[in-house]
Amino acid sequence: MDPQELTNEVLLESILDCTHFVSHEVPNLFKSVKESLPHSDKIFFMNFVEDENGEDEYYGYIYDKTTAAIYEYYFQDSKSLKNRKLSLAKIDISKLTTKDILELPALHLL
């Protein structure tokens, strides 16, 4: 196995771990994204960042394998369903680099 394959495997594992974490530890975010992208059955989270002030705010990137699109997201959670806010912005993949999303080279493995 060459170093590039190993690197891609590590990056793939990072994507899968991040997606698993969000789906189990931040289920409101996962549910909100699924509701916003109802025709997407394969969604993967990357670059998950949690607000350090305990405000239940999260941001990062989502890869929608169904449409081969990447979205930047911002999510503000709340105990009250009415106050949850999700912002999704589709990003032009061709303009992204590994400085934006470290896992970018591994997307083809999903």
Predicted segments — roles?
Residues 1-58:
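Anionic N-terminal interaction surfaces
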Residues 52-59, 65-106:
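Phosphoinositide-binding peripheral membrane targeting modules
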